[in-house]
Amino acid sequence: MNIPPEQSAEPNAAVSRTGLSPLQETRMSVCSNRWYSVCFQRPSFYEDGLFFYPQRESGENSKKRGLNMNNMTEIRWHGRGGQGAKTASLLLADAAFLSGKYVQSFPEYGPERSGAPITAYNRISEQRCPIHSNIYEPDYVVVVDETLLESVDVTAGLKPDGAIVINSAKPAEQLRPLLRGYPGRVFTIDAGAISHKHLGAYFPNTPMLAAIVAVSRCVEPEDFLRDMESSYRHKFANKPQVVQGNLDCLAEAMREVKE
């Protein structure tokens, strides 16, 4: 549905071609630690990382406008190169953006090679976020590769009332000794088995994406599944079996994630 010019964010803005709400059509800054550009509509695919929200605003200005940072959810992803943690972070941002939220998604790399540890981040908020930094005290942590528990302090800064979601076939209590005394909630899901079952290969990022949505409720599950179906049908237009496999992955992961 097109938005009439008089409802646009700018007086002389062009008519929308994306069918998004007026909030989503607001002029957005798209930036990352490597690129900065400006876009006026949602892109189909992403660069390395994006911040989606209207024009930048300082923390002092946000206080004057009464912005409540308690409405913000911060998520940190831990994985290895090639496992899709960065892609999952971007897809989560896409789904949250389409539900009318302000979002950030960006990665942090070490050595850029397959199998090397990487970190990715999400901020999801009901209001614009003036923060432009890594996330040091996340509400949620997603661990895409269980072996990282032995070498990386994945719970660093994780809020005690938050949660960690780990890709593992082991029960949560068996993994607690590796979490360096973290007292909060621990969820596990065998993302590898789920992806092998529905996709015939090891793609843990798809089940882990669904698991963090189920645990955090940063996006309504129904909205999330609807947006993901639309994205998959666009990306894999000539591969209906791949679309259905991914959708089955998401649905089973949301059911099977356990505390």
Predicted features and spans:
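Alpha-helical structural elements
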Residues: 30-31, 40-41, 47-48, 72, ...
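Polar/charged alpha-helical tracts
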Residues: 1, 5, 17, 66-68, ...
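Cationic, amphipathic, low-complexity alpha-helical segments enriched
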Residues: 1-30, 34-38
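Positively charged N-terminal leader segments that act as targeting/secretion signals
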Residues: 14, 18, 36-53, 65-66
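Active-site cofactor/cluster-binding pocket
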Residues: 68-259
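Enrichment for repetitive, rod-forming helical segments
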Residues: 24, 48, 62-63, 87, ...
